[in-house]
Structures are given as structure tokens and as C-alpha cells.
Amino acid sequence: MKVPAYAEIGVTTNFSFLEGGSHPQDYVHEASRLGLEAIGIADRNTLAGVVRAYSELGNEDLIHKPRLLIGARLVFADGTPDVLAYPVDRAAYGRLCRLLSVGKLRGAKGECHLAVADLEAFSQGLSLVLMPPYRFQASAIAAALQRLTALESGGVWLGLTPYYRGDDKRRLARLKRVAWAARVPGIATNDVLYHHPERRALQDVLSCVREKTTIDKIGRRLEANAERHLKPAAEMARLFRADPDAIAETLRFAAGISFTLDELKYHYPDEPVPPGKTAQQHLEDLTWEGVAEYFPAGISDKLHATIDKELGIIAHRGYAQYFLTVHDIVRYARSQDILCQGRGSAANSAVCYVLGITCVDPTEIDLLFERFVSEERDEPPDIDVDFEHSRREEVMQYIYRRYGRHRAAIVATVIHYRPRSAIRDVGKALGLSEDVTAALADTVWGSWGKGLNEMQVKQAGLDPHNPLIGRAVELATELIGFPRHLSQHVGGYVLTQDRLDSYVPIGNAAMEGRTFIEWDKDDIDAIKMMKVDVLALGMLTCIRKGFDLIAQHKGVRYALSDIKSEDDNAVYQMLQRGESIGVFQVESRAQMNMLPRLKPKCFYDLVIEVAIVRPGPIQGDMVHPYLRRRNKQEPVVYPAPAGHAGDANELEVILGKTLGVPLFQEQAMRIAIEAAHFTPDEANQLRRAMATFRNVGTIGKFESKMVGNLVARGYDPVFAKNCFEQIKGFGSYGFPESHAASFAKLVYVSAWMKCEHPDAFCCALLNSQPMGFYAPAQIVGDARANEVEVRPVDVSFSDGQCTLEERCGKHHAVRLGFRQIDGFVWADPDEERVRREAGLLPSEDWAARIVAARARGPFNSLERFARLTALPKRALILLADADAFRSLGLDRRAALWAVRRLPDDVPLPLFEAASASEQLDENAAPLPQMPTAEHVVADYQTVRLSLKGHPMEFLRPLFAAERVVTCRSISESRVSGQRMRCAGVVLVRQRPGSAKGVVFITLEDETGIANLVVWPAVMETFRKEVMGARLLWVEGRIQASPEGVVHLVAERLSDRSFEMTRLSDNLAAPRLGELHEPLNDDRREHPDNPAQRIRHPRDVRILPPSRDFH
């Protein structure tokens, strides 16, 4: 007997967040394996996952390709049973998107508030399947069907789902009678929640997370069995053997739906152009106007040909409108004095340069336009433009105003489960205690690894063989990579000529005034929609604020173009010493170590510096050959083809500036084009294959072709193989040369400001936080080391932002602003500008109240300050705790005492204030002086830095007794192999993907910083200490390079954070009998452990957290 075909119309993916237990791609593969006629993906009030299923259908590994039905499960706020809605054609799909947008724009981010009444305006062409719950009232189902059949739709069905609870026969018969009475067909569906029965346990966990309960308390809210998976047609036919029409109806249903995502024909918005001009003509006019502006003396024939070629490709591909859009956005930003700069592959375009979008001069860098746009490649261009991060919102709101929210929205980003979040959610769901889940989660840092191993479980103090722990680890590993929710992209906009909400639903973002679509950048690439990237860059904010400070206090106004990269030798000398804290792109540990080795002397050296410390060049083994050649330790050799197979100098032309070593993506592509005779399109395919080969293994065909072509043209086979291996090492991490050049411009400008105006640079950096590698304490410490005086927060002198004050020696002094006080309410001027333009009320601003009150006369007492500012008592306590009343003659302790005696949040009238003041003076008791060490601790807790000292100063006697040397001693050591001990505050932890598991740690004490290297084996032994310590003790061996780069290679580590709780001015060195080996002393149970004795709330967090990168 022939098995009837079957289409499953009720599939829920994991984009029904915390409900579906399988990826869309999983369903496509399982439906293919089972030979299903079609699958219908219908997630809860969303189309977020459909493009992934659509894209997977193009996978060549699929033996059978089921039809994909695109739909959504409409969940109503008024209690109406769920409805599966499938558009029969393109117009109906647009209506479904708009319906979902209506619901999403009513609610907060992640919500969708729909009522059945909303369907009336959008139901035309939607095939609707009512999905009754397990327990139902026939009258309610009949009423819902009556309401649906009254709509103008593509048809109405009643979903028939077996629940495998022993009553399916009776239940389905009841539903069939309701359907017959309503004159609608019944349709079979397994109402699928996961693609395979093995996913049932994970789906149970997701249900617990969604319901905020545990597996032993969720009860009937869990599915009763593991049957809600995709089933083969034969199994569904067996289940519905009493109603074969329900199976046949699935095929009729699928046949009535013609819509596919192939029908989404994207139309980029038409930009306004002068009368009688096309977009292309207007773009060409702007381009040649830019040429005249940037090159008043004229351009070479080569550059003229380059621009002509680019304009020709833009015309052929129809991208003129896109270039006009980006040009307009950049024009607007500059009209508002917002710094911006294009980067990425767009910097390969001479047209982008003369339009003012990018800063890479085509006469300085050999551009490869095919890296950006190709005649042969049907891919939209992608222009990334960075704007000041504090003012980007002004640009974003301009885009909304210009195009309207129905035509412009931000692209989504899918937030996935990572190891730590997966462990926490699974642990809670399984009923593990918070202590256990925290212990497990704390062994994972960021996105390291794919899950937990047995060693990590043991390090958490848990038994890896405990069945519950083992199950938690197994399920958490399975959950990693699942979508958790949608967020907004960092700045990618989709713009359309028609309504954007007819392509994809639009919803509210968490941030006020922003809306975003449900698809991420990969989704819109698959649909061939174009994206405009409006990105945020903190360094642009810092540079603009620095320029403003220089103009205000030194009378010179600079622009980015005024800072010439070859003018100041002192800047390069500073960088050669590795003095780059705060400098854009070269302040990381690896970059600081590279600077003394590479010794940059010119701008192109900075281009190489930016690019060389990347996983691509490192994994391709390009760094050491380049440095050896640069230092004349190895000859520069350019292989040439044998005989007359080609130009003997072709590789020298390509690799000459990098001494024969390929460092940039463009060089890899040029080698493929010039030496291996790839077409430009094939070269770009090679680049894309290199970016993904570790995941999809598509690079093999390019390897054989490239190596074969090189050998055929007379190149040595060993060279050909090595060349390809080097290029393959780029992976997805190699920089385009144009991108590195864009960033190198900002490297130089920020280095120039640090070198020539360290006062303005420090102040601007502090006012641009959070950004960069280093916390305010290190920024301030570096400025002080460069002869800049930094003054504390004070109510008589500080503003909301940090400011410059009168000169003190060579430089102006930096006054810390109220923004440095943790928890203090102040308003950022840039954000307030956006609020004003949007018609919103100003934000609360305690700092502005202080500044306004100060204009009415000096604060000669705390009581007068409280009366004039009318600040809440909480603000006064924060100021006192930050030691901000020194100018009034009150230190931290005295100020706190005085504040606490003030009435609660009641402004004092004039005479009452005078009386209160007299009473305070009368009753004031002398307070013991607060030790400096306690002040330092309090400074770190309140303003995240201290100008009074470093915590390690006061712990030095204790550590000296343990033969611990200073960080300066480590950094000045030149004896490789020497064993030394060091201790300090952890500033930065890094575990780059290219470092093969090596962790780099930067420690700081009162003398400076020391750099640690922790090899993987040591990391596994001391994972808890490496990841969790704020004050770290380490023993290891010195590793010193000839260039003066020094590391301490760690062998043993100990978390000594508890020592911070015992800080005191008169801390004495321990007696001989109290000396201990840190590794053998479990401080958690030590009877003298100060951490166990001190319970003051201040001791909960003494130091701000380190900055960790991975």
C-alpha cells in the first residue's frame, strides 16, 4: 500500500524564543531525510527564523528538498486560540509583515500585542489555521472559527493535533464535529516543537526558563511526552488512519500557497537629484567636484582611469542611489560638526575618497576596487562609516526623519546562548542551587570553548560524575548557540523605496526612539537587501572632545585633516617606546609589545602595525618573517615564474611594501589574480571561502586551482603550497589594507594628541568612557607619568565632565568631573542635544545643579551647599563618600558625618539653616583621622581611581616578606629564565583566538605594570585564579626580547584579593612565623582571614573589575 505524502504545517523553531527546541536548519535537514512534501515554519508572532530555513534549502547536501511554507503563529492577547497564518502570495506576505509590525510597535522590545480584530485589515490572502489548545470548549472554538471565516482570507482550517495522552481519538472526533459544523476542513499537524525526539529534554529546560520555574515544579506546563517532533508521512498517516482527509488536506493546503522568499524584490530608495539628472549623473557630478576639491592641481591619468572604471561598475550594477545615500549621511554629520570616517573594504574606492566618505588617499595606497564591488559579483556594496559614539544618535535620528520609520529601521542581531548564560539557565531549570550554578559559570570566561569539561567541573568544587551535574553540563553544551532574543545591530540600517514593513516586521528597540527589523545581517544578505552601516567609534568622540579642549584652552582649532602623519618625529619615538596607553588600536598588550619590535617611523609603518597584530597574519606565520626582513636578519626574496611564463617582478609589485610577506587581503587577492590567473570574482570568492573554510570546508577547490596555476606558470611547487597556506591563515581575520590605512589615520591623530597635548588627551579620554582597553585609573596614572597634574572631584571646582584648569608646569591641570563618581546622576551634553531635538524633557542632572548654584557664590559650608543645590540626600552622601568636600574643609569622614545629620531631603530655609549650622557646630565631636590606605580604598570604590596612592603601596611590606618584587622590577629585568614573584591589581585579561589558548594578563602596582603570559596547561590548573582574581600573586620566569619586551611566564598563581580588605596605613610586615606559601594556604577557611571578619558593605567591592577581552 502506497504511503500518502504529507506536509507538516505547524513547525516551531528556536526563534520562538524559549519555546522551540531546534534550529530552522535542523528542520530542513530532518524534513529532507524524512521525505516530507513541505514544512511550514510558523514561529510565535515572528518571521525571525524563516530566512535561515530558506538559505538552508540551498545546501547541496540535501538529498530531497521539501517546499518551505513561510508563516507565523499569531498569538493573541485577548485569549483567542493561536492561528497559523500563511500568505498565499507576495501581497499577502506584505500584509502579514505589517500585521506583526502593528503588534510589535504597540509593545516594548520583544513584545507583540495582537487582537483578532487586527486581522480584519490584513487577512486578505492569508491561509489561517486555528490551533485549539489541548483542553478546549467546543463553543469557544466554534466562535473563533466563525470570526475567522467572516474575514476575507485565503481560507480557514482547523488544526488537528494528537497529544498522545490517551484521549486523542475522542478529542480529535470532537474537533472534527466542530469543523464540520463550521464548514471548514480539518488539517493534520503534529504541532512540532523540535526536529528529533532527542531534543525533548532541552525543550523541557527551555520551558522552565520561559516559565521561570524548575523542572520539579513546572508540572503540567511541560509536554507529557517526547512526541512533538517531525514525523514521517507513514507515521502521521497511521495516527490519522481514522481521518485520512486530514493528511490529504496538508497537501491541498501547501498547494494553495505559492509564495516564496524568492519573490522579495528589493528596491533601494530613490535619492533626490537635481532636475533633469539621473542618480548616476548626479553621483558623477559630485565625484568630479570632489576630485577638484581634493586634487586642485589635477590628477594622474591612472587615477582618472580608476575613477572612470569605478563609476562604470557602479552604473552597471545600479548602485548610484546607495552611494548618494551614504554621501548625504556623511554630509549631514559634517554639517553638525560630528566627526566621521569610512573604513572597511569601502576604503578601496577612489570614488568614496573624493566623496568625502573615506580618508584613504588613492595616490598613497594601491586600491583594489574588486575587494569592494565587482562587475561580476552580484553582491551589494557595504560601506561602513564610523561616527563619534556620543553623537551617533543624532545621525540615526536624521535617517529616521529623512526616510520615515516605515522605510528605515536598524538590522537585528541575534543574541545567542554562550557558555556562561547557558550554564546559568540550565542550572536554574534543573534546580541546582545558585552557588552551584555560579561556581560552574565562573569557570567560563565569555565565549571561550563550546561547553564545560571535566577539569572545569572539578575546579568548581563539584563532582563531574554526579548525574545531575553531568546532565546540566550536557544540556548547557547543547544549548550553546541557541538564539536567546533579538537585539539591534551596532548600526546597520536597511532602507527601502516601498514600505519596509512589507518585507519584514518592524518592532521597537529597547532604546527610546529606535526601531529594528527581525532579520540580521546574514538574513538580509541572503535576501539581497542593502545595508548602510552607521557605526559608533569612541576614539572619534575622544578626538573631537580633545580638539574642543585644545581650542578652548590653547586657542588653536584643529581638524582631522590638519594632523599630517609625517610631521612629528616625537610621535613615532613615543610609539617606538611602546608608550601607547589610550592610543587607538595600538594600546592592546600585543600591540604594545609589537611597537618596540616594529619601530614605526612613517605612516605606512602604522598601517602595517594595525594589520600585523591580527589572527590572520599570526596564524599564517607572516609576523616573524616580516620582522626578520625588516631588521635585515633575512633577505627579501620575491619568487618569480620560470622561463617566460610571466612578469618576473609581478610578486615584487604586489608584495614590495611588505617585504615579500602577504599581510593584507588585497595582496592575497592580487596574488590570485596576477600570479595564479584568477578572475577578480574568483579571487573574491577565494577570500570569502577563506573566511568560512573552518566551518563549511569550501576552500579545497580554490587550493587545487591556485597551487596548480602557480606551478603551471613556473613557480616552485613548495613556494606555491606555502603561499596558499599563508593566505589561508588569514581566515576571517585578515585586514584589508585600505581598512588598516583608515584606522592608521586615527592611530596617528590620537598618538599626536597624546604626545603633544597629553592634558587634553587625558581629559577627552575620561569624558569619552567607556571605551578602549584601560580604566580611568590607568588613564590618569599615565597622564601623571607624563607630567600632567590631575586634581580630584570637588564641589567648588568640578563640572559634570572632566575639565582643564590653569597651567601647572608644561601642561594644563585636569580636574576630574562628577561623572567619575559611581552612581552620581549627570547628563551627557551630547545625549541632551538629541533629547531636545526629539522634544523630550531634559534628564535629571545633579552636576548641572551644582554648577548653577556655584554661580551664586562660593559654598562656604556644607549646609549652604545643600541649601543652594537642593540635592537629594543620596547625592550628598555620594559626594561625601567621594571626598568631594575638601574645599569646604571636610574630609570624607567628616563630610559623611555632617551629611547624615542633615534633615532628609528637605531644603533648609535661610534661618533654619543658620540654626542647624550652629547646632552642628555645637554638637560636633572630634573624629579620628581616616588612614590614607582607607582613603585609597574608598576612592577606588567611589571614583574608580585614587590620586592619594595605590593599594599595593600599603600591602608592599606584606608582599616584600614573601620575596615579591615590584612590577617595575619585572619590566626592567633583562635576564631570561630568571625566576621572580610579582603581585598586583589585574587590569586586563586577554585570550586572543590566535593565541592557541594562551592568556595574557596585565598587572599593576604602585611602580607600574607587568605583563604575564599564562600557557594553557597553567591556565587549566589555575583557571579560577586567572579568571577571578582582582589582586593576583604570580611566580614564574622572565622572558625578555632583544627589543626590551619583557614578560613573566606564569608557573604558579594565587588569588590574593582578600588582602584588599586589610588595607591600613600602619600595616606591618608579618612575623616570620606568619609567612606562608600562598598556594598552600586556603584563605577561605583561614582563621585570620580578614575577609571573614570584615562585614562592612564597603568591603563587598573594593576595586572596579578588570577589562577582559577574548
Swiss-Prot record:
It holds the Pfam family PHP. SMART domains: POLIIIAc. Keywords: Cytoplasm, DNA damage, DNA repair, DNA replication, DNA-directed DNA polymerase, Nucleotidyltransferase, Transferase. Gene3D superfamilies: Metal-dependent hydrolases (3.20.20.140), Nucleic acid-binding proteins (2.40.50.140). Belongs to the DNA polymerase type-C family. DnaE2 subfamily. GO terms for biological process: DNA repair; DNA replication. InterPro entries: DNA_pol3_alpha_NTPase_dom, DNA_pol3_finger, DnaE2, DnaE2/DnaE/PolC, DNAPol_HHH, NA-bd_OB-fold, NA-bd_OB_tRNA, PHP_dom. It is found in: Cytoplasm. Residues 1073-1088, 1097-1110 have a biased composition (Basic and acidic residues). It is an enzyme of class 2 (transferase). This is Error-prone DNA polymerase. One of its GO terms (molecular function) is 3'-5' exonuclease activity. Residues 1072-1110 are annotated as: Disordered. PANTHER family: DNA POLYMERASE III SUBUNIT ALPHA, ERROR-PRONE DNA POLYMERASE. HAMAP family: DNApol_error_prone (MF_01902). GO terms for cellular component: cytoplasm. DNA polymerase involved in damage-induced mutagenesis and translesion synthesis (TLS). It is not the major replicative DNA polymerase. It comes from Rhodopseudomonas palustris (strain BisB5).
